A protein has these predicted regions:
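Mixed-charge, low-complexity intrinsically disordered regions
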Residues: 1-87, 93-131
């Protein structure tokens, strides 16, 4: 864990009780998006409480040998320059076919205009680009 993330994590832990379960975890740190500019935009949506969900392709994890996300995972969200800005916890994880993603999920993801049509257009492009 890089020193900035470690320091951020320690500040977060200091806000918790001594027996809080997060004290036993080592968080993953990551950026949302595929460019520094998009990472900054999405981190700002997280901080504003607008972005409360995300979507990924399962193959993106298996291709690099990473496990799929799990409920209860705690993560540090980074800006595009790698600076930590938020601690998030995965409260639910589901594998859903692209065509079955619903409007409620699209709204929780908080990107674009928040509509399902916008979500599908953006993610179809992003997922095609990834593969």
């Amino acid at each position: 864990m890089n020193p900035d993330v470690l320091s951020f994590w320690r500040v977060y832990l200091a806000t918790l009780g001594d027996s809080h379960a997060h004290r036993l975890l080592t968080p993953e740190a990551f950026v949302f998006g595929d460019s520094p500019e998009l990472a900054d935009e999405l981190a700002a949506l997280v901080l504003a409480g607008i972005k409360r969900a995300t979507a990924s392709l399962a193959v993106e994890f298996s291709a690099v040998g990473d496990p799929l996300p799990s409920t209860g995972d705690v993560c540090v969200v980074l800006r595009g320059d790698g600076q930590p800005v938020a601690v998030i916890e995965r409260t639910a994880v589901a594998q859903v076919p692209f065509g079955e993603v619903d409007a409620a999920f699209a709204a929780r993801e908080g990107e674009g205009d928040g509509s399902l049509a916008s979500w599908r257009a953006n993610h179809e492009r992003d997922f095609d680009y990834a593969h």
